[in-house]
Every structure is written in C-alpha cells, then in structure tokens.
Design a protein with these regions (language model features):
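Conserved catalytic region of serine esterases and O-acyltransferases that act on ester linkages
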Residues: 2-35, 39-43, 255-348
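Substrate-gating cap/lid alpha-helix
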Residues: 189-224
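A short helix->loop->beta-strand "cap" motif at the edges of active sites that frequently abuts
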Residues: 174-176
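Serine-esterase "nucleophile elbow" of acetyl-processing enzymes
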Residues: 42-118, 138
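Structural beta-sheet core signal
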Residues: 78, 144, 179-180
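Oxyanion-hole/transition-state-stabilizing segment in secreted/luminal serine hydrolases
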Residues: 124-161
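Short "lid" loop at the C-terminus of a central beta-strand within the Rossmann-like core
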Residues: 184-187
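Short, conserved phosphate/pyrophosphate- and ester-handling motifs at nucleotide-, phospho-/glycolipid
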Residues: 249
Length: 348
C-alpha cells in the first residue's frame, strides 16, 4: 500500500510544480513575449512563497462503515492523489473516502469496507502500484481522483491519460466498477494569479475532457468536478479551501463527495434520484460531444451507451449523459455518525 502520509516535502514539491507550470505557460504560446514569460515566472515565485508548509498527513479512513447493517460488505477502494487521500482535513470523517463510504452504506443499507490507497503527490503514472494493492482486496468499486499533479508537473496529456486508462482497464478486467472524478479546476487556486491562473484553468479543462473520453472508452464512468466545483471554490475560497489555500477544506471535500456518490451508486446497480432534465443536456450522443457537454454542465455523469443496438456511430462510441441528484453526504457527518463509528482494521 502506498503511504498517503508522506507529506513532509509537500511545500518544496508544490513549489517545483508551480515553477514547472509557469514554464508550461511560457512555452505554450510561441508568440508570447519575453516580458509575458517573466510575469508568469514571477507569479510562480509569489505562489511558492504563499503556500504554507505541510503540517500533517491526511487521517486514515480505512475500515468498515455501517458494520451493524445486514448483508455482506461492499468493498470500495479510493485511488489517486492528495485530493483522494483527503489532504487538508484533520478528521477521518471529513475525508472523501469516509464521506463516500458513509453515504454508500446509508443508501444501500449494507456495510461498506473502505480501503484507501491514494498517495499524496501522486501522478497518473503512480496509479499502477495503487491498483495492484487494490486488487488484493477484491474491490467492488473504485473511485479515482487524479490529474492535478499531472498538470503542474507538465506530464503530456496523452501520457497521463494512458496511465489512467491502464488503471481503469485493469480494474474492470477484475470485475471492479470504476468512477473517475476528472481533473479539478486549478484556476480557482488563489496563490496562482492571472495570467498563470488562466492557463491553469485551460489545461485543467483540457485534461478533464481527455480523461472523460478515455475512461468511458475503457469501461468506466466519469463525473466532471472541475466545472462544478470551480465557481463555488472561486466565490468562497475561505470556506472551500483548506489552510494551505491549495487543497479543499472539509466542506469542499463534502461537495465533491456529494457529486460522486450518485454515480458510485449507479455503478453498483442502485438507481439514484435524478435532478430535473435540462433540455439538450441529457441523452445519448457521441463520446467526444458528451465530454464537451459534461464540461459545460456541472456534475454530469458520462458512461458508455448503445443506440439501436450499436456501441458506436459515425462520431465514435456512444455515451449517455445523466444528471444525478446530489445526496445529503454533502453535509459533514456529526460526531458519532457512521463515519466516526467505522471499525478500523489495522490502520494508524
């Protein structure tokens, strides 16, 4: 299992990432002037000075949730980077894994066994060892949150997507359902100032769209988080971001979990509630068009579909767009809830 608590060099790592990201902006537009490049590099240096030192690793959240409920437990694994590990919060019940396991247990009325293999600072290339560890526990469903570090580390998008696809295919081949929360909107991070912030937003959305197409092709489902969380995080940064102004706060993670939970339920065969239909948003269309629509309409689920008995049409694979109702998991559970009473199994 990867050690999600290895965060001592987080500030230095984040500083290098921001500097590299500034280099992306400097080289991404050939016509950019040297002065523009200097502005970007200056903004990167300012962001490095603003982001504080790491204080503690994210709390462990492994265990059985709803242990007293009837039936065999559903096994869920959480893979990805610091956003999957829950970096930025201090209580187990505030982590995305705990929020999802609690909500899943309540909706299914069954125990949920949670294993977190996410690693702080992980790139998409780090998913392979996480998947290998996850397969040992025979998961029913995997939730993957990854992509932000690929943007800041200048990972070529085709390379990052290939690693993600390999992870999804391996899990699906083992009979595990897969839900991917696509790349977050890095343009909401306050220590990053315009024009570097604009580049961050553009690259985040490009990677999220590429992830959507590739994951659905590989048999998984996606939920667009960037375009949903971006406006809320930009409007209320004091509430949505943690103390480091880079990672989500407890409330930020709760909103993300509320968006992911309906799709996790659907992947497991449950039928979650749906929000009112938006004309022109829901329905079956080509996968590239579906990815574009999902980016424009927050919280939209994208999954594979058939049309007239065919998986593919002139525009490629068919995809289904759905809008799910956000469940009450968005509220951080109070002390004494199922999240706090989870049976821990050998966790630190």
């Amino acid at each position: 299992m990867g050690d999600a608590g290895s965060v001592a060099p987080v500030r230095r790592q984040r500083a290098r990432q921001i500097a590299r990201f500034a280099a992306i902006g400097t080289g991404a537009t050939v016509a950019a002037t040297a002065a523009t490049g200097g502005v970007l590099l200056g903004q990167a240096r300012q962001a490095r000075r603003t982001i504080p030192m790491a204080q503690a690793p994210p709390p462990r959240c492994d265990g059985v949730y709803g242990a007293k409920l009837p039936g065999p437990p559903v096994t869920m694994v959480i893979l990805g980077d610091s956003s999957a590990a829950g970096y930025g919060v201090h209580r187990r019940r505030e982590t995305p894994g705990s929020l999802l396991a609690t909500g899943l247990s309540r909706r299914l009325h069954r125990p949920v066994r949670l294993h977190r293999f996410a690693v702080v600072g992980s790139l998409s290339s780090g998913l392979k060892p996480q998947v290998e560890s996850a397969l040992e526990v025979e998961p029913d469903v995997a939730v993957i949150l990854v992509g932000g570090n690929d943007v800041t580390n200048r990972t070529p998008f085709p390379v990052a997507v290939r690693y993600l696809v390999d992870a999804v295919r391996t899990l699906r081949a083992a009979g595990c359902e897969v839900v991917v929360g696509t790349c977050p909107d890095l343009g909401t991070i306050r220590p990053i100032q315009p024009p570097l912030r604009w580049l961050a937003r553009r690259w985040s959305r490009q990677l999220a769209a590429a992830q959507t197409v590739a994951v659905v092709e590989a048999g998984g489902r996606t939920v667009s988080l960037g375009d949903m969380l971006g406006p809320r995080f930009a409007a209320e940064p004091g509430r949505m971001f943690a103390w480091d102004r880079f990672h989500p706060s407890a409330e930020g993670y709760a909103i993300a979990a509320a968006a992911l939970l309906p799709t996790v339920l659907s992947a497991l065969g449950a039928v979650p509630e749906r929000r009112p239909v938006l004309p022109g948003v829901e329905g079956v269309r080509s996968l590239p068009e579906a990815a574009h629509q999902a980016a424009r309409h927050a919280g939209t689920e994208v999954s594979g579909a058939q049309l007239r008995g065919r998986d593919r049409g002139p525009g490629g694979r068919w995809a289904q767009l759905r809008r799910r109702a956000f469940f009450g998991v968005g509220a951080v559970p109070p002390t004494g809830s199922a999240a706090d009473s989870a049976t821990l199994e050998g966790t630190a």
